[in-house]
């Protein structure tokens, strides 16, 4: 890795994001598409920008992301986690602010498996007493 680039891996649900921070003007490129074209939902775009806005580094870096797996929400969360880790790689003093906002901790919630005899993970067939 060159000194001009910082890297972070982020994960959320089944999505994995590889994030590269390079000095620049604030462009965010996800799978060779812009942030606005990749995410249709404004909430997903907001989630991706959260660590940058918190640390006031929005216009400071160009961000290149490759993300695979999961859905829209999981991918947005994975990118946020990856950006957070890359920012900590860039400047360790940002860790406390990012930790306080809850961006450093990997969200460990996963989909619960479906059980035999049930319709879904917890939904049971209707019970008939008689």
Swiss-Prot record:
Protein family: Belongs to the universal ribosomal protein uS9 family.
SUPFAM superfamilies: Ribosomal protein S5 domain 2-like
InterPro entries in the record: Ribosomal_Su5_D2-typ_SF (IPR020568), Ribosomal_uS9 (IPR000754), Ribosomal_uS9_bac/plastid (IPR023035), Ribosomal_uS9_CS (IPR020574), Ribsml_uS5_D2-typ_fold_subgr (IPR014721)
CC annotations in GO: cytosolic small ribosomal subunit
An individual GO BP term: translation
An example molecular function term from Gene Ontology annotations: RNA binding
Gene responsible for this protein: rpsI
Protein name per UniProt: Small ribosomal subunit protein uS9
Keywords: Ribonucleoprotein, Ribosomal protein
Disulfide bonds: none
Domain of life: Bacteria
């Amino acid at each position: 890795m060159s000194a001009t680039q910082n890297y972070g891996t982020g994960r959320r649900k089944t999505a994995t994001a590889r994030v590269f921070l390079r000095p620049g003007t604030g462009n965010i490129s996800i799978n060779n598409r812009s942030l606005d074209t990749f995410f249709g939902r404004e909430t997903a775009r907001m989630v991706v920008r959260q660590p940058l806005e918190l640390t006031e580094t929005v216009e400071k870096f160009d961000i290149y992301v490759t993300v695979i797996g999961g859905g829209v929400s999981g991918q947005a969360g994975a990118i946020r986690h990856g950006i957070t880790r890359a920012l900590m790689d860039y400047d360790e003093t940002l860790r406390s602010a990012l930790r306080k906002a809850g961006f450093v901790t990997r969200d460990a919630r996963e989909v619960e498996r479906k059980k035999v005899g049930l319709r879904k993970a917890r939904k049971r067939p209707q019970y008939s007493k008689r």
